[in-house]
Amino acid sequence: MRIWIRADANEEIASGHLARTLSIAGELRRLGARVRFVLSDEESRSWLQRLSGNPDEWEMSVLGLSYGKPGEELPLLAKLAEGERPDWILVDSYAVSGDWFEKLRSTLAASLQEKQGKENPAPRLAFIDDERAFDPEADLVINYDPDAESLESFYQKASFRLLGPKYAPLREQFADLKPAVRPSVRKILISTGGTDPYGMAKRLQKLVQCVPETAVMAPGYPRVEKVAELLLGCDLAISAAGTTLYELCAAGVPTLAFSMADNQELFAKQMAAAGAVTYLGDIRNPEGLEKLEK
């Protein structure tokens, strides 16, 4: 089975889309699928190579477009599919819309039919969604937000729906962890995700100087390969509200979460409502930053 993953990363959208699809790609490859990442530009290629730790680990195709122009990539995707027809295309992007999925399906079908001279079904489409902005014209939709199981009626167009935390795309190293009981706080983890536009890592380090040991996962700090092992050794975490929150839950680490983007704010509030984290607020607002510093 051939599967394409259409995702990007840059300073604007950070690395979450590629990070979670890398987890999915690893499992798909283990099951025997051939996976190709289809990226907007060279910046996304650099992010993927950095996140995977091996520049040659994954097959990649770069469309040569600026991020955020999904309409312009439709003919390029169709042309690419003529040479290597995928069985599935998994899309993880905030730039697309409901109309885009309909146009992608019809563009692919028309291109393949013209190329092969007969009716040929277009690749199936899958979509990872955490914004709930539209009901995608997809064969499969994935939403692993804490309250996503209540969205069954929202996603009417998808043939299959994978909804709720049990579908969170955690890496294999987080399977079957055995968290330890933490009687005191001697080691704190600070995590900002793939980007740190507000310099929170250094600011937080200054705030927790009284703690004997601090670990940091943020841009400009040494890359951590064995993340699960690191998390198991931490007694408390202060983390941006990305998929890392699910990893912290898997490791049983009590977590103070903050947000610095709109999608993070929604996710953090959902995780707090579920009792999984304590949400301190959005650091883009003075109130949230003040609460975090206290």
Regions from the PLM with identified roles:
Residues 212-221:
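Catalytic donor nucleotide-activated moiety binding site of glycosyltransferases and closely related
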Residues 245, 249-292:
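Catalytic binding pocket for nucleotide-activated donors in carbohydrate/polymer assembly enzymes
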Residues 1-4:
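Extreme N-terminal starter segment of soluble prokaryotic enzymes
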Residues 232-243:
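Acidic donor-binding loop of glycosyltransferase active sites
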